[in-house]
Amino acid sequence: MIELSGVTKSFGSKHVLRGIELQLDRGKSLVVIGGSGTGKSVLLKCILGLVRPDEGLITLEGQNVLTAEREAFLARFGMLFQGGALFDSLRVWENVAFRLMRGPLKRPKDEAREIAVEKLRRVGLGPETADLFPAELSGGMQKRVGLARAIAAEPEIIFFDEPTTGLDPIMAGVINALIREIVTEMGATAITITHDMTSVRAIADRVAMLHDGLIRWSGPVGEMDSTPDPYVQQFIHGRATGPIAAVR
């Protein structure tokens, strides 16, 4: 469904992506792991067409992402942002229904609210939450609202950017379980960026290790712990010594 071939991207003299080769089938969940500053966010932006690669090709079902009609293309995606990225001035339901009240996905206001309340229910939040403002919610509740917003428009592809950052282990486990359940129910294709190895094991079908602008290893999550790849082993066990410099 999504394929990257020979993708490179530099910013000045800094080579962020140096020939990415990656493929993800429809309905599968890929988790990209790697240290801070290794290009994971740039990779996502390239897939979305928000950053233009210097070289290489990225296709979605065979179509170049850079030549796709923008609104229709972006309507196929949902995203859970690292910091929640909720609009403080909008009520919870308005945040969830944000894409349903404008653009090609626009619905009547009452219908958009109804969908938002249903998506909130799906992530474990009652209808009484709908008219609150984000500041009235805990961090875990805000993360659930972000997840509800990501799925509100029934996207084919969902990006999760550090979905458990800032959450305690119990709430992180709840979010991981919700992500796995919802992605499976929807039959969506998912790409997740995370440093949290518990999340990796909970939500991944496949894992790709990104370091120094290259995919150093990719494979089924069940093979991650047994691979002899030194980059993967150092990263997943948090070792200070190995091919990845401890100070970057």
Residue ranges and their predicted role:
Residues 158-161:
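Catalytic Walker B motif of ABC-type/P-loop ATPase nucleotide-binding domains
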Residues 133-137, 141:
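Conserved ABC ATPase signature
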Residues 48:
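Helix-to-loop junction immediately C-terminal to a conserved catalytic motif
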Residues 109-128:
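Conserved ABC ATPase "signature" region
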Residues 64-78, 109, 224-227:
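ABC ATPase NBD coupling module
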Residues 154:
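Conserved catalytic motifs of ABC-family nucleotide-binding domains
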